[in-house]
Amino acid sequence: MENLCQRLNACQEKILDYYELDSNKLTDQIDYWKLVRYECAIFYKAREGNMQCINHQVVPSTVVCKQKAWQAIEIHIALQSLINTDYNTEAWTMRDTSYEMYMTEPKHCFKKEGTTVTVVFDCNKENTMDYIRWKYVYYKTDIGWCKGTGDVDAKGIYYTQGAYKQYYVDFKQEAEKYGTGVQWAVHVCGQVICCPEFVSSTCSSNQISTAKTAEPVSNATTQTTEAYVPVGTKETEAPYPGKRRRLSGPDTTVTTVTTVTTAATQPGQSVDYTNNNLHSTSGGHHPGRDTSSDQTVFIVHLKGDTNSLKCLRYRFKKHKGLYCNVSSTWHWTSNDTNQQGIVTITFNSITQRNNFLTTVKIPQSITSTLGIMSL
């Protein structure tokens, strides 16, 4: 018994030395785990001898001794194999080589430089969950240890294994666990990434990417075009046969043909914001302009990335009193495959529109254009 006490004292003294050293060398971490293995062996031997205490310490049960010994052996062997790689010169702290870190997702891998990823389920800020994205992941293969980089997209959190993505957090499964499994939004490093199902309601399938599709969200002032553009909309037949124009997007089910005519205000014309009518001081006739509309509203066109517009439009729900209506994401019909999406917001007055632009923060990546529209 005295022999076990002396050995345990010597072992634990050396363990405390490594705690105080706080080394970042891989060789020191290997020596530390070798001492932990030795400590577990002493406790196991003491339990076999029916010893309840040793050096005023309670001896763990046989099951606990075995479990801790297996953990120490697993980490010790993994570190011994890691020292034979090119990664042995990197900084390895006691935290990096702890068993808890080793068994954190992705399990049985060493990880460094974690970043918190917050996921909001079902558009409910009260229903959130935090996950960790690791910048570097060291994983074991048949040929030895390899180093991959971690990242996050709309599908989940992953690390690279060569040219492949190894997901260790699946947002779809997490959404089914914590919500309805339909909608989720990923917040990481100032970016917002929406799930594909949430985006697809207003985006065509060939414009959706499950990778990093969201633009950085910024509270800076939005670039605003101060040109007032009268826009007339007629839901009748197209003015030119064979050139029918429609709004693109899978959620657009308009059966009537919409012709949008944009015209800058000509010299001699002015916009009267009191009665919302367009006046001409020259008395001339302007073809293509319909001034017989019953109602004219003030609008803001938001133009930018389709996914960013989708996320931004969802945030508008918190400010319903600041606008009248908001459209779905639409595009001009053209041969340009890289065209940006457009969202149109209507207002009752200039004051309401100004209050909206002052209250709602628009990302810098989205351009806003002011104008009026006849309904």
Curated annotation (Swiss-Prot):
GO molecular function, one term: nucleotide binding
Pfam families xrefs: PPV_E2_C, PPV_E2_N
Region described as Disordered: spans on this chain: 264-292
Keyword terms of this UniProt record: Activator, DNA replication, DNA-binding, Early protein, Host nucleus, Isopeptide bond, Phosphoprotein, Repressor, Transcription, Transcription regulation, Ubl conjugation
One GO cellular component, as annotated: host cell nucleus
PTM annotation, UniProt: Phosphorylated.
Biased composition (Polar residues): 266-283
Presence of the UniProt keyword Plastid in the record: no
Region DNA-binding domain, annotated ranges: 296-375
Domain of life: Viruses
Known function: Plays a role in the initiation of viral DNA replication. A dimer of E2 interacts with a dimer of E1 in order to improve specificity of E1 DNA binding activity. Once the complex recognizes and binds DNA at specific sites, the E2 dimer is removed from DNA. E2 also regulates viral transcription through binding to the E2RE response element (5'-ACCNNNNNNGGT-3') present in multiple copies in the regulatory regions of the viral genome. Activates or represses transcription depending on E2RE's position with regards to proximal promoter elements including the TATA-box.
Entry protein name: Regulatory protein E2
Organism listed in the record: Human papillomavirus type 26
Recorded name of the encoding gene: E2
